C-alpha cells in the first residue's frame, strides 16, 4: 500500500484540511525532476524547502491550537465535575443522568486526544517519507537540515502523560457517580484462593497513547500522592542492577535456574529522592510449590555505599525502626534477616553496579482491588554502570552521577546506552480458581496494539545489549529486535469511539512507498516474534493456505543413505547401506515430520556469531514423576530377574544353579543400565537440555539378554540330561 493511499484512507474527516499535502509534494518533486531531465538544482531545492515549510507550519499550528483546545475542555469538565460532586451532599443532589453526561463529555475528549495523537503520528511519518523520497531521487541530502526545522516545531513530541492522569481521575469520578473507590493499592495480595498470572508485552510507540486511553476507560491511573499536582518526574523509576565480573546473576536469571537472584537498588522520582529501596528478586520453579518473590527494605541514600561495603551494619539500619516501635517485632526481624542475606551476598559474590534501567511508569489499578493491575513503562533506557572495560563509570559510588532522570540522556556515549524502541506493558491478573479474566483485558492483550514477549527482563536485556562482548548466551527476543511488531488493526469492542457513533477509520500500520501487496499479505499472517513460547503453539510455522495433502521432510542422514542406496554399484553395497540406514533410523529417530503442503519456515532470525539463544523452558513437575515411574518400572524388571536367579540358586538342582548365572548377569546389566539412564535423564531435565529422552537400547538389550539367559539355562539342562 502506497503511503499516499494509506494517508487518504486513515485521515480523520474533521482534520482533513490540516494534514500534510503529501501527494502535492510528491507531484511537485516528480514534475520538477521530469521538467529538468532528472536534474535537481539549488533553485528547485529552495522552492521545495519552502513548500515543506508551509506544510510544517500548517500542521504545527493546527496541533498547537487543538492541543490547547483539549486542555481547555479538560479544565472546563474538571470544574463541572467538582461542582457536581459538591452537590452530592446538598438538598438537590445530582442525578445519575448528570454523571452520564459528564462521562460522555470525557469520552469525547478521550476521542479527541486519540485523534490528535494519530494525526501527529501520521503527519510526522508523512514528512519523514517525503524527505526520504526527496533524498533518494534528487541526490540532495535534506534530512538533517529539515530535522532541525521539525525539532523547532515539535508537534510530534507532545507528551500526553499529564493529560492522561487528569482525564483518568475525572473519568473515574464520573463513572462511579462521584464516589470513586478508595483503599490500599496493595490490598488483596495475601489472599490464597487466587490464580496469579503476570504477562508482558511490547507496545510500539505509535500505539502508546491509544493503549493508555483504552485502559483508563476501565481502570484509573494509580496516583500514589493525590495531595500534589502530577509532575513528569513523579512517574520516573530508576533501578541499579548488581552483578559480578562473571555475570553469575545474569546467567542464573537467563536460564531461570531454581533460586536465581537479582539484586537491585531502586528509587522513585528524581535524583533528590532520599529513600532508596534495596531489593532482591528470587526465581522459584513451579515444581517446588513456591512462587517467585520480591523482597525489599528502605535505606537512606547517604548510607548506601557503607551498607554495600559492610561498614553500615544491619543493626544500624533498623535501630530507628526498633526504637520507634511502629512495626511489629516479627516484621522487623524478617527485614533484618533480608538485609543480612543481601549484604552477605553482595560481599561474598563481589557484586557491583552493572546496568541501570530508567523508565516512566503509568500504573492502572482500582485502589484496594488487586484483581487487575496494569503498568506501562515508556522511555525505557538501559545505561552501563560497570567498570569491566577499565572505565570506572561510578567512580567507586553505588551509581554514576553524570546523569539523572533527564531522558534521553544525550550526554552519554552510544556504547554506554541502549534506548529501548518499545514501551513495556505488564498485566497482572488475580482471579478466582476457574474464573476467566475480564473480557476487555482478553481483547486488549489479543489486539494489534501489543506483542507478547514472555519472561522479558530489563536486566537481562540491558546486560545482553551493553555487555555483548562478555556474554555467551542471549535472550530469545534479542535477535528479533529489528522485526516490525506492528500489525493490521482488527475490529474489537475496546477501540476508542465517540459517544453515539462508531469510528472504524483507524488503520495505523505504515508502509514504505516501495512496499507492495505481498508484504502487506505477509504482515497479515505474520505471528510477530516467532520465538515467543506462548505463540509457538499456534504459530509453529508461517503457513500459506493449507490443504490436507502432507509432504515429507527427511533428515540429512536419511537423504544421504537414500542417495547411496539408489546409486549403489552392486547388490552387496546396496544391502550394506540399507542395513546402515535401518540402524540410523532406529537409533537417531525418524526425523521425518509431516507438515501441511505449502508451509514455509522463517529462518531469518539467527543468533549472532559466537552467541547462543537461551529460550526459557518450563519443566512441569509431572516430568520428574514420569522419570521416576520409568526408573521404578525398569528396577522392578531387574528385581524380578534377580529373584528368578536367587530362586534357581537356592532351591534348584546343580544344573539349575549354573543356569541361574545368565539370569543374574541379565539382572545386573538391567540394574546398571537403569541407573545410568535415570541419572542421565535427571541431569538433562534439571539443565533443561533439548536432547532425545527416548531409550532406544534398553528394551532391545533386555530382550536379547533374557533370550540368551533362557537358552543358556535350557542348554545346561539339556547337557545334564
UniProtKB/Swiss-Prot annotation:
Residues 721 are vacuolar. InterPro entries: DUF202, SPX_dom, VTC_Complex_Subunit, VTC_domain, VTC_sf. There is a cross-link at residue 75 (Glycyl lysine isopeptide (Lys-Gly) (interchain with G-Cter in ubiquitin)). Gene3D superfamilies: VTC, catalytic tunnel domain. GO terms for biological process: engulfment of target by autophagosome; microautophagy; polyphosphate biosynthetic process; polyphosphate metabolic process; vacuolar transport. Residues 126-133 are annotated as: Important for inositol polyphosphate binding. It is found in: Vacuole membrane; Cytoplasm, Cell cortex; Endoplasmic reticulum membrane; Cytoplasmic vesicle, Autophagosome membrane. It is a multi-pass membrane protein. Residues 489-512 are annotated as: Disordered. Activity of the enzyme is Mn(2+)-dependent and enhanced in the presence of pyrophosphate (PPi). ATP binds at residues 200, 264, 266, 281, 294, 359, 361. Its main location: membrane. One of its GO terms (molecular function) is polyphosphate kinase activity. Residues 1-148 form the SPX domain. Residues 1-630, 673-699 are cytoplasmic. The active site is at residue 458. Catalytic subunit of the vacuolar transporter chaperone (VTC) complex. The VTC complex acts as a vacuolar polyphosphate polymerase that catalyzes the synthesis of inorganic polyphosphate (polyP) via transfer of phosphate from ATP to a growing polyP chain, releasing ADP. VTC exposes its catalytic domain VTC4 to the cytosol, where the growing polyP chain winds through a tunnel-shaped pocket, integrating cytoplasmic polymer synthesis with polyP membrane translocation. The VTC core complex is an integral membrane heterooligomer composed of the catalytic subunit VTC4 and the accessory subunits VTC1, VTC2 and VTC3. The complex exists in 2 different sub-complexes: VTC1-VTC2-VCT4 and VCT1-VTC3-VTC4. The VCT1-VTC3-VTC4 subcomplex is mostly found on the vacuolar membrane. The VTC1-VTC2-VCT4 subcomplex is observed in the cell periphery, probably ER and nuclear envelope, but localizes to the vacuole under phosphate starvation. Each subunit contains 3 transmembrane helices. VTC1 is a small membrane protein without hydrophilic domain. The SPX domain has very high affinity for inositol polyphosphates, such as myo-inositol hexakisphosphate and 5-diphospho-myo-inositol pentakisphosphate (5-InsP7), and moderate affinity for inorganic pyrophosphate. Its affinity for inorganic phosphate is 2 to 3 orders of magnitude lower. SPX domains may integrate inositol pyrophosphates (PP-InsP)-dependent signaling to adapt cytosolic phosphate concentrations to different metabolic situations. This is Vacuolar transporter chaperone complex subunit 4. It comes from Saccharomyces cerevisiae (strain ATCC 204508 / S288c).
Amino acid at each position: 500500500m502506497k503511503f499516499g493511499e494509506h494517508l487518504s484512507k486513515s485521515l480523520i474527516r474533521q482534520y482533513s484540511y490540516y494534514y500534510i499535502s503529501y501527494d502535492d509534494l510528491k507531484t511537485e518533486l516528480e514534475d520538477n525532476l521530469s521538467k529538468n531531465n532528472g536534474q535537481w538544482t539549488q533553485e528547485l531545492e529552495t522552492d521545495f524547502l519552502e513548500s515543506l515549510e508551509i506544510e510544517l507550519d500548517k500542521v504545527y499550528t493546527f496541533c498547537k491550537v487543538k492541543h490547547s483546545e483539549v486542555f481547555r475542555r479538560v479544565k472546563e469538565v474538571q470544574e463541572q465535575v467538582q461542582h457536581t460532586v459538591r452537590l452530592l451532599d446538598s438538598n438537590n443532589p445530582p442525578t445519575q443522568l448528570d454523571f452520564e453526561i459528564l462521562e460522555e463529555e470525557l469520552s469525547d475528549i478521550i476521542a479527541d486526544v486519540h485523534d490528535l495523537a494519530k494525526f501527529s503520528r501520521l503527519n510526522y511519518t508523512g514528512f519523514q517519507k517525503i524527505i526520504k523520497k526527496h533524498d533518494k531521487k534528487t541526490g540532495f541530502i535534506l534530512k538533517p537540515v529539515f530535522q532541525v526545522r521539525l525539532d523547532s516545531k515539535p508537534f510530534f513530541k507532545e507528551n500526553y502523560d499529564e493529560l492522561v492522569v487528569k482525564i483518568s481521575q475525572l473519568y473515574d469520578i464520573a463513572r462511579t457517580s462521584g464516589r470513586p473507590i478508595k483503599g490500599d493499592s496493595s490490598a488483596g495480595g495475601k489472599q490464597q484462593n487466587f490464580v496469579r498470572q503476570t504477562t508482558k508485552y511490547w507496545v510500539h510507540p505509535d500505539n502508546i497513547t491509544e493503549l493508555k486511553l483504552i485502559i483508563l476507560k476501565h481502570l484509573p491511573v494509580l496516583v500514589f500522592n493525590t495531595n500534589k499536582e502530577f509532575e513528569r518526574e513523579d512517574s520516573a523509576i530508576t533501578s541499579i542492577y548488581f552483578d559480578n565480573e562473571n555475570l553469575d546473576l545474569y546467567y542464573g536469571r537467563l536460564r531461570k535456574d531454581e533460586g536465581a537472584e537479582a539484586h537491585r537498588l531502586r528509587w522513585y522520582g528524581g535524583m533528590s529522592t532520599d529513600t532508596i529501596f534495596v531489593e532482591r528478586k528470587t526465581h522459584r520453579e513451579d515444581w517446588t510449590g513456591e512462587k517467585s518473590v520480591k523482597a525489599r527494605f528502605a535505606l537512606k541514600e547517604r548510607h548506601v555505599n557503607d551498607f554495600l561495603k559492610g561498614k553500615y551494619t544491619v543493626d544500624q539500619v533498623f535501630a530507628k525502626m526498633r526504637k520507634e516501635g511502629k512495626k511489629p517485632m516479627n516484621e522487623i526481624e524478617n527485614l533484618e534477616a533480608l538485609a543480612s542475606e543481601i549484604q552477605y551476598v553482595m560481599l561474598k559474590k563481589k557484586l557491583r553496579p552493572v546496568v541501570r534501567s530508567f523508565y516512566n511508569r503509568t500504573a492502572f489499578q482500582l485502589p484496594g482491588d488487586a484483581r487487575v493491575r496494569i503498568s506501562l513503562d515508556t522511555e525505557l533506557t538501559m545505561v552501563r554502570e560497570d567498570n569491566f572495560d577499565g572505565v570506572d563509570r561510578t567512580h567507586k559510588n553505588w551509581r554514576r552521577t553524570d546523569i539523572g532522570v533527564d531522558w534521553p540522556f544525550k550526554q552519554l556515549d552510544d556504547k554506554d546506552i541502549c534506548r529501548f524502541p518499545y514501551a513495556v506493558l505488564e498485566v497482572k491478573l488475580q482471579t478466582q480458581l476457574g474464573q476467566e479474566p475480564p473480557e476487555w483485558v482478553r481483547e486488549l492483550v489479543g489486539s494489534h496494539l501489543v506483542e507478547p514477549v514472555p519472561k522479558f527482563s530489563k536486566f537481562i536485556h540491558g546486560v545482553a545489549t551493553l555487555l555483548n562482548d562478555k556474554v555467551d548466551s542471549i535472550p530469545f527476543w534479542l535477535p528479533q529486535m529489528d522485526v516490525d511488531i506492528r500489525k493490521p488493526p482488527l475490529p474489537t469492542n475496546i477501540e476508542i469511539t465517540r459517544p453515539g457513533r462508531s469510528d472504524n477509520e483507524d488503520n495505523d500500520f505504515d508502509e514504505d512507498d516501495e512496499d507492495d501487496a505481498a508484504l502487506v499479505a505477509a504482515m497479515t499472517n505474520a505471528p510477530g516474534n516467532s520465538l515467543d513460547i506462548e505463540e509457538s503453539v499456534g504459530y509453529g510455522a508461517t503457513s500459506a493456505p493449507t490443504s490436507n495433502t502432507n509432504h515429507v521432510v527427511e533428515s540429512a542422514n536419511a537423504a544421504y543413505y537414500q542417495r547411496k542406496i539408489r546409486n549403489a554399484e552392486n547388490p552387496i553395497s546396496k544391502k550394506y547401506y540399507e542395513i546402515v540406514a535401518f540402524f540410523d533410523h532406529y537409533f537417531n529417530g525418524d526425523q521425518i515430520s509431516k507438515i501441511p503442503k505449502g508451509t514455509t519456515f522463517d529462518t531469518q532470525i539467527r543468533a549472532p556469531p559466537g552467541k547462543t539463544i537461551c529460550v526459557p523452558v518450563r519443566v512441569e513437575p509431572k516430568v520428574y514423576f514420569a522419570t521416576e515411574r520409568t526408573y521404578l518400572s525398569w528396577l522392578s524388571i531387574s528385581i524380578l530377574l534377580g529373584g528368578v536367579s536367587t530362586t534357581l540358586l537356592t532351591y534348584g538342582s546343580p544344573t539349575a544353579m549354573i543356569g541361574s548365572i545368565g539370569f543374574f548377569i541379565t539382572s545386573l546389566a538391567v540394574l546398571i543400565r537403569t541407573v545410568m539412564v535415570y541419572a542421565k535423564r535427571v541431569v538433562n531435565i534439571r539443565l533443561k537440555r533439548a536432547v532425545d529422552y527416548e531409550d532406544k537400547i534398553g528394551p532391545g538389550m533386555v530382550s536379547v539378554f533374557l533370550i540368551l539367559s533362557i537358552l543358556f539355562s535350557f542348554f545346561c539342562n539339556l547337557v545334564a540330561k
